[in-house]
Structures are given as structure tokens and as C-alpha cells.
Amino acid sequence: MYQPDFPPVPFRLGLYPVVDSVQWIERLLDAGVRTLQLRIKDRRDEEVEADVVAAIALGRRYNARLFINDYWRLAIKHQAYGVHLGQEDLQATDLSAIRAAGLRLGVSTHDDMEIDVALAARPSYIALGHVFPTQTKQMPSAAQGLEQLARHVERLADYPTVAIGGISLPRAPAVIATGVGSIAVVSAITQAADWRLATAQLLEIAGVGDE
């Protein structure tokens, strides 16, 4: 049963681009995307604060679900829609502070054991990855593939889920067919020859998410 310790999110978050700049946040919001994540890695809070503030303001303007990856203190300070954390960040994060601030929480997982850890935190949604090999970031685990993804989705049938990792436009329909509520994409949009067309096609497949 879906009873998160954090504010709930829609069961289907739809297309969920993960990008590293405010410019991409603005482009995608303008293109109709309504669930996004700002993921800027390996910089100090003070170096990214202006970008976090700008991204959150854009999310509000478009009434979108804007998640901040990792920088949970800044997300709380500036009242983001939500925070996304990797497994390695869970232990070092004050989850009670995120909860008290009324922010949603998403957690990454890569296998059944990590799903157990995520469920113990009772987040707003659980990300399942990486589905396919990905060049976007170094991954310590093997790609899960569609069969494993479908098994995890079935296990988490009552939970909002997000598939991530190597999801290209041609692969997206098969990923959605597993029943997962959302697909997170990176290079499928940011490295597309025509990002507007790629975004429109992915929105056709995954939707904008439930209200």
C-alpha cells in the first residue's frame, strides 16, 4: 500500500527529463514537460544556489514538479517541489528535515536490496535503474533490462515508479509497456539532433503525468 512518509506524487509522473542546467529546465517547461529534475554534480552548495533558485522559480511559474538532485538543504531553503537522492546519499541526509519542510522525496534503486532500503524510507516515488547501459554516468551495477524492470514494477504495484538509464526514443514504448509510471531520460533529449521533436515524441509515449 502506498503510504509515503513524505507528500505523495501522482502515480504516473510521465516524461521525466533529468538535466544539468536552468537553460534546459526552461526549454523543457516551455515544450510542455511537467516533471523534471535538476542534477548538478560535484559542486558546493554556494556554487549551485543561484541555479537551484532559478529552477525552482521556473517550476512554480509553470506549475511543474521540479525535483532537485542531492542538494537537499537548498531544496528545503527555497521550497522546491521535491528532492531526489541516490542510495549513497540517504544515510548522509536529514530525511526528517525534508519531511518537515513538506518536500516530496524520490530515491534511486538498482536491485531488490536497494528497493528494500528505499521502501524503509517510505519516499514519494522510487526510481528503478539502470534499465539499459548508459553513458551518462558511471554505474557500479549491471543494466537490469526490461524483464527485471517489469518484475520490480510488479513488486511495487502500488507505488509511483520511475524507470531510468539508457532509455532512448526507440526503447521508450517497451519501457512504458512494463507498467512503470514514468521514464526518466537524459541524452534522449539533450543529445538529440532535434530536441524539440524528441521531447514531443517522448511526451506522446510517456505523457505529462497525472494531475
Swiss-Prot record:
- Tell me which residues bind 2-[(2R,5Z)-2-carboxy-4-methylthiazol-5(2H)-ylidene]ethyl phosphate: T134, Q135, T136, G166, V186, S187
Please provide the Gene Ontology terms (biological process) for this protein. thiamine biosynthetic process; thiamine diphosphate biosynthetic process
Q: Name one GO cellular component term.
A: cytoplasm
How many cofactors are bound and how? Answer: Binds 1 Mg(2+) ion per subunit.
Q: Is Magnesium among the key words of this record?
A: yes
Molecular functions (GO terms) = magnesium ion binding; thiamine-phosphate diphosphorylase activity
UniProt-annotated binding residues for 4-amino-2-methyl-5-(diphosphooxymethyl)pyrimidine: Q37, L38, R39, I40, K41, N69, S108, K137
**What is catalysed by this protein?**
2-[(2R,5Z)-2-carboxy-4-methylthiazol-5(2H)-ylidene]ethyl phosphate + 4-amino-2-methyl-5-(diphosphooxymethyl)pyrimidine + 2 H(+) = thiamine phosphate + CO2 + diphosphate; 2-(2-carboxy-4-methylthiazol-5-yl)ethyl phosphate + 4-amino-2-methyl-5-(diphosphooxymethyl)pyrimidine + 2 H(+) = thiamine phosphate + CO2 + diphosphate; 4-methyl-5-(2-phosphooxyethyl)-thiazole + 4-amino-2-methyl-5-(diphosphooxymethyl)pyrimidine + H(+) = thiamine phosphate + diphosphate
This chain belongs to the protein called Thiamine-phosphate synthase
Which positions does UniProt annotate for Mg(2+) binding? D70, D89
**What is this protein's function per UniProt?**
Condenses 4-methyl-5-(beta-hydroxyethyl)thiazole monophosphate (THZ-P) and 2-methyl-4-amino-5-hydroxymethyl pyrimidine pyrophosphate (HMP-PP) to form thiamine monophosphate (TMP).
Question: Lineage of this protein's species?
Answer: Bacteria, Pseudomonadati, Pseudomonadota, Gammaproteobacteria, Enterobacterales
Keyword Transferase applies? yes
CC cofactor: Mg(2+)
PANTHER family, from UniProt?
Answer: THIAMINE-PHOSPHATE PYROPHOSPHORYLASE, THIAMINE-PHOSPHATE SYNTHASE
Please name the pathway.
Cofactor biosynthesis; thiamine diphosphate biosynthesis; thiamine phosphate from 4-amino-2-methyl-5-diphosphomethylpyrimidine and 4-methyl-5-(2-phosphoethyl)-thiazole: step 1/1
Could you tell me the EC number(s) of this protein? 2.5.1.3
